Regions:
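Short, polar/acidic, helix-capping and beta-turn segments at strand->helix junctions
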Residues: 1-159
Length: 159
């Protein structure tokens, strides 16, 4: 089960990515008992934000979707890294909660729809039973590196 995520991502056509490195003094993932806390993930590919700017002013709907999906993939890459390094066999992975921060203007109102791209991908990866989660979508005035989105998550695992 420790390589479950890697196999699952491959089976649904998602190319495995190397886990992101922290851009400041924090860890990308922390395991505490049976909870894994994944730090906010940006839509970074090859060291760059794929589409910088505000969701509603600078990006098309397709670019927003790609950004959210890439941030979600980056979250799973970090989650996978901490899971494969465990000595014990993992029998269950469940997404408990996600938070999505959207770089947008005061007039933006599509927070729920935008974060659905992340939620849909999580359910696709983990299945409805283990992928369904609570969530919060938050509009903000800016994000690190002028990213359009940042996503963090809390997952539970059973040994």
């Amino acid at each position: 089960m420790n390589n479950f995520l890697e196999k699952r991502l491959k089976n649904i056509g998602i190319k495995k990515k190397s886990p992101s490195k922290s851009i400041a003094n924090y860890l990308p993932c922390v395991l505490s008992n049976n909870l894994i806390f994944v730090s906010g993930q940006l839509p970074i590919d090859n060291g760059k934000i794929i589409y910088p700017g505000k969701c509603d002013l600078d990006l098309t709907e397709s670019e927003i979707k790609q950004s959210v999906e890439l941030a979600t993939i980056n979250m799973f890459s970090n989650l996978n890294e901490i899971i494969i390094n465990q000595k014990k066999k993992i029998s269950l992975i469940k997404c408990c909660n996600i938070k999505g921060y959207l770089n947008c203007s005061d007039k933006f109102e599509n927070h729920p729809k935008t974060l659905n791209y992340c939620s849909d991908m999580i359910v696709k990866i983990l299945g409805k039973k283990f992928g369904s989660h609570s969530r919060t979508a938050i509009g903000v005035n800016s994000l690190p590196l002028n990213a359009p989105v940042e996503i963090d998550g809390v997952f539970s695992i059973n040994f």
